[in-house]
Curated annotation (Swiss-Prot):
Start and end residues of each Bulb-type lectin domain: 23-131
Gene3D superfamilies from the UniProt entry: Bulb-type lectin domain
Key word Magnesium present: no
Name of the protein in question: Curculin-2
Length: 158
């Protein structure tokens, strides 16, 4: 079981490295600080100084976490349990994906199609169809063939 998980992680990171995706990936335990961004093609995901997480396409805002004004000098962190969190400068949670599981290796990827996806091990038992965020439902997709209608996806390894 552990060998299968390790192989999955190695394949995931080899793919990320070979595609030159360093600017579009945030790994578990890493932080994106206020004013910094992930970029993929025409899309940019920025954590702003006012704590708003915003996705842009060609410089035009197309999605936001609606957390502006809820703190200052915020940062976006992908925790080792898979939970994506915006913290303010007092380490208070401003926004979170509220999806987490066992500690593991996860990767937030801003894809070429503009979706930002969290890849990693299974976070919940079968039958649970989604996780709540602080501002709405996060669509969970088991694989890349399922319909994608939201901006955030949780992709799990079977």
């Amino acid at each position: 079981m552990a060998a299968k998980f390790l192989l999955t992680i190695l394949v995931t990171f080899a793919a990320v490295a070979s595609l030159g995706m360093a600017d579009s990936v945030l790994l578990s335990g890493q932080t994106l600080y206020a004013g910094h961004s992930l970029t993929s093609g025409s899309y940019t995901l920025t954590i702003q100084n006012n704590c708003n997480l915003v996705k842009y396409q060609h410089g035009r805002q197309i999605w936001a976490s609606d957390t502006d004004g809820q703190g200052s000098q915020c940062r976006l962190t992908l925790r080792s349990d898979g939970n994506l969190i915006i913290y303010d400068d007092n380490n208070m949670v401003v926004w979170g994906s509220d999806c987490w599981g066992n500690n593991g290796t996860y990767a937030l990827v801003l894809q070429q199609d503009g979706l930002f996806v969290i890849y990693g091990p299974v976070l919940w038992p079968l039958g649970l169809n989604g996780c709540r965020s602080l501002n709405g439902e996060i669509t969970v997709a088991k694989d890349s063939t399922e319909p994608q209608h939201e901006d955030i996806k949780m992709v799990i390894n079977n």
